[in-house]
Amino acid sequence: MSGNTIGKLFTVTTFGESHGPALGCIVDGCPPGLALSEADLQHDLYRRRPGQSRHTTQRRESDTVKILSGVFEGLTTGTPIGLLIENEDQRSKDYASIADRFRPGHADYTYHMKYGFRDYRGGGRSSARETAMRVAAGGIAKKYLRERLGVEIRGYLAQLGPIRIDPVDWNAIDDNPFFCPDPARVPELEAYMDALRKEGDSSGARVNVVARGVPPGLGEPVFDRLDAELAYALMSINAVKGVEIGAGFGCVEAKGSVFRDEMSPEGFLGNSAGGILGGISTGQDIVASIALKPTSSLRLPGRSVNIRGESVEVVTTGRHDPCVGIRATPIAEAMMAIVLMDHYLRHRGQNQDVVRTLDPIPPSAF
C-alpha cells in the first residue's frame, strides 16, 4: 500500500489502523534545534480526540503521544522523529455483523475491490482515527512556523448542516466542543445535533482554516503551486468532498473589477485569492475552506451488497461521529501547517540568497 507519505523536504508518513494496537508516524526533515516535547503536541491532540462531548463518538481514547526518536535533551536533532499513539478503547465486536457487508458511503467496497481483502474493524486504515498522527505531526510544523516565522494557523467551524456561522470571534473557538467562533450560536448547534442523534442520522459541515504571518514567496510553480498542494493535503482528510481557496467558487459570479486584489503602497486592498497568486504566497492571510460529507455510519437501515454480491441491509452499531466536521478543525490546521512547513524549507533551500529590490507590501491597507 503506497500513498502514505506527504511532503518533499518536510515529510510525514503515517501508519496504523483504527482497531490495531497503535498508530504512528515518521516526521523527516525537521530542522535541528527546535525545542520539542510531548506536551507541545498534546494540546492539539486533546482538541481532536474523541469522546469529549455527547456530539462526537463515545470511543474513549487518551491519544497520549510518545516521541520515540529525533529528539535529544529537549531539542530536535534533524533526524527522523518517530511518534506513537496506542489505541486503548477498540470494540471490534461491534463490527462483526458487517464483516462480509459493505457499508454504503464508506471505503469498505473500494478497499475490497483494490486489495481483495479488508480490515472491517472500524474501517481499518480508512478510518479517521489515522488523523491523530497528522495532528501530532502538524504540531511540530505549527511550533516551528510559529517560533521561527511568527506564523499562526487557526481554524473554526463555519457551517454545520444548514446553520451558517458568522461573525468570527477567535477567542471563543476553543471554548466549546464545536470550535464555533460565535458563542451565541452554540445552543442552536447543540439542539440541531441532539435532534440528529434522536433520528439516528448525521450531518455535513464546513470548516475554515486561516494562516496568518506567512511570508511572500512560498510555492513552487507550476505543478507544486501552494494552493494546489494545500488542496491536495486538505482533500486527503477523511470525508472532505470539496476545498476552496479564498473566495473559491464565489469567483464564478464575481466581476474581475471586484475580485482582483488591488494593491497600494499601504497594502493589499482585498484578498479574494486567499493569500496566493500564481501558486505563490502573497504575504496575506492564507484562507482555505473544506466541505465534509455527512457520516455514513448510521443506525438507519441502508441497502447494500455483501462480498458475494447479494443484496443486504446494513445497520451500523459502532461508535461514530454524527458529524465528522466537529473534530475536523485541528486536522485541517495540521494539514495546512505541514504544507506550509514543507514549502518554507523548499523556498529557503532554493531562494535564500535572492536579493529583493522591493520590501513586502503589507497584507492589508486597512
From Swiss-Prot:
Catalyses which reaction(s): 5-O-(1-carboxyvinyl)-3-phosphoshikimate = chorismate + phosphate
Cellular component GO terms held in the UniProt record: cytosol
Residues where NADP(+) binds: 48, 54
Presence of the UniProt keyword Amino-acid biosynthesis in the record: yes
Principal EC category: lyase
Pathway: Metabolic intermediate biosynthesis; chorismate biosynthesis; chorismate from D-erythrose 4-phosphate and phosphoenolpyruvate: step 7/7
GO molecular function, one term: FMN binding
Pfam families: Chorismate_synt
Co-factor binding details: Reduced FMN (FMNH(2)).
Gene Ontology BP terms: amino acid biosynthetic process; aromatic amino acid family biosynthetic process; chorismate biosynthetic process
Cofactors demanded by this protein: FMNH2
Known EC number: 4.2.3.5
Keywords: Amino-acid biosynthesis, Aromatic amino acid biosynthesis, FAD, Flavoprotein, FMN, Lyase, NADP
PROSITE patterns in the record: CHORISMATE_SYNTHASE_1, CHORISMATE_SYNTHASE_3
Keyword Lyase tagged: yes
Residues the entry annotates as binding FMN: 125-127, 238-239, 278, 293-297, 319
Subunit structure: Homotetramer.
Cited function: This reaction introduces a second double bond into the aromatic ring system.
Family classification: Belongs to the chorismate synthase family.
Protein name: Chorismate synthase
Phylogenetic lineage: Bacteria, Pseudomonadati, Pseudomonadota, Gammaproteobacteria, Methylococcales
